Design a protein with these regions (language model features):
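Hydrophobic structural segments
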Residues: 1-196
């Protein structure tokens, strides 16, 4: 049977932990590399509901985007939300792998998926962050172009459909859209960089 280590190694090949940003906490955060994993649940966050779903389907592993454990843990108790989740995972032999900024940055990761969903060709990064194991440049965010210039209202419609959302925050400057920048996650620090690139 497949082991947690096999799944971790597969995910690490797609989005190496070495790509993560310094503040982040990714990889196997709860569990045992040598435990078997017959079923896996994917989630954005490890919530109480996600843990209950994993238990109900008999999943031995949850793979989430956002880390369950972010800062230093001084204690693991049932009085604390994160502590309760960790206790529940351990009691039910459920491991947790988190792939956060490494998945955002990786080739084919979150930022590339966003560009693809919007129909844009990737031309570069908002900010270089280093090189991968093969020596290829990697970075935060993506910059690219649509196949043709379109009106702002049409671009908003594409965004709503691609992201499956009913609402967007925007400022209509009355301009057409051709070049764009995306940044998975908060991205507030990259707003100025995006203005340089587009």
């Amino acid at each position: 049977m497949t082991k947690i280590r096999d799944i971790y190694d597969f995910l690490n090949a797609l989005a190496p932990v070495s790509l993560k940003m310094d503040f982040d906490n990714v990889g196997l955060l709860v569990g045992d590399y040598d435990a078997e994993a017959g079923k896996c649940l994917l989630a954005l966050d490890i919530t109480d509901e996600v843990i209950q779903e994993a238990k109900s389907i008999g999943a031995e592993l949850i793979v989430s985007h956002h880390p369950l454990i972010f800062g230093a843990i001084k204690s693991v108790t049932a009085d604390d939300l994160t502590g309760r989740k960790i206790i529940e995972l351990i009691k039910n032999d459920i491991s947790a792998i988190c792939m956060h900024t490494n998945l955002d940055i990786a080739q084919g990761g979150v930022n590339d998926a966003l560009m693809s969903a919007l129909g844009a060709n990737v031309q570069g990064f908002l900010e270089l962050s280093g090189k991968d194991a093969e020596g290829n440049e990697v970075g935060c965010g993506r910059v690219g172009e649509l196949k043709s210039e379109i009106g702002f209202a049409e671009f908003l419609s594409i965004c709503k459909k691609a992201l499956n959302t009913g609402g967007l925050r925007y400022h209509d400057a009355g301009k057409k859209v051709k070049r764009l920048a995306v940044m998975g996650g908060a991205g507030g620090s990259c707003i100025a960089l995006s203005l340089i690139h587009i």
